From Swiss-Prot:
<comment type="function">
    <text>Binds to 23S rRNA.</text>
</comment>
<dbReference type="Pfam" id="PF00238">
    <property type="entry name" value="Ribosomal_L14"/>
</dbReference>
<dbReference type="InterPro" id="IPR000218">
    <property type="entry name" value="Ribosomal_uL14"/>
</dbReference>
<dbReference type="InterPro" id="IPR036853">
    <property type="entry name" value="Ribosomal_uL14_sf"/>
</dbReference>
<keyword id="KW-0687">Ribonucleoprotein</keyword>
<dbReference type="InterPro" id="IPR005745">
    <property type="entry name" value="Ribosomal_uL14_bac-type"/>
</dbReference>
<keyword id="KW-0699">rRNA-binding</keyword>
<keyword id="KW-0934">Plastid</keyword>
<comment type="similarity">
    <text>Belongs to the universal ribosomal protein uL14 family.</text>
</comment>
<comment type="subunit">
    <text>Part of the 50S ribosomal subunit.</text>
</comment>
<dbReference type="GO" id="GO:0003735">
    <property type="term" value="F:structural constituent of ribosome"/>
</dbReference>
<keyword id="KW-0694">RNA-binding</keyword>
<dbReference type="GO" id="GO:0009507">
    <property type="term" value="C:chloroplast"/>
</dbReference>
<dbReference type="InterPro" id="IPR019972">
    <property type="entry name" value="Ribosomal_uL14_CS"/>
</dbReference>
<dbReference type="GO" id="GO:0006412">
    <property type="term" value="P:translation"/>
</dbReference>
<protein>
    <recommendedName>
        <fullName>Large ribosomal subunit protein uL14c</fullName>
    </recommendedName>
</protein>
<dbReference type="GO" id="GO:0070180">
    <property type="term" value="F:large ribosomal subunit rRNA binding"/>
</dbReference>
Length: 121
């Protein structure tokens, strides 16, 4: 569960390393789960990259420490909270995605993120 003020690692090569959630998009949601879109501010970034520190970006949550229950009764959780930075059309701004992503990302029609990911769990 990703609340406002939660720090997330960035799972792509846009140059941002850490972002902080400042808003969960989609109605009156209190927290974001895997596949939800958030507004975040970049807290750590690499120099000379497209995304700079203190930029406000949109991101899709791809991994959470909180376990989620699937339809078949299986639970899945990850070691970190991670997000992929996207543009207004929900396409990733980076050209690579690092680490595994959950299958729920495919169900939410983020097929470009799924195709860039090395592993889908």
């Amino acid at each position: 569960m990703i609340y406002p003020q939660t720090m997330l690692t960035v799972a792509d090569n846009t140059g941002a390393k850490k972002v902080m959630c400042i808003r969960v998009l989609g109605g009156n949601k209190k927290y974001a789960k895997i596949g939800d879109t958030i507004i975040a501010v970049v807290k750590e970034a690499l120099p000379n990259m497209p995304v700079k520190r203190s930029d406000v970006v949109r991101a899709v949550v791809v991994r959470t420490k909180k376990s989620i229950r699937r339809q078949d009764g299986m639970y899945i959780r990850f070691d970190d909270n991670a997000a992929v930075i996207v543009n207004m059309d929900n396409n990733p701004r980076g050209t690579r995605v690092f680490g595994p992503v959950a299958r729920e990302i495919r169900d939410k029609n983020y097929s470009k993120i799924v195709s860039l990911a090395p592993e889908v769990l």
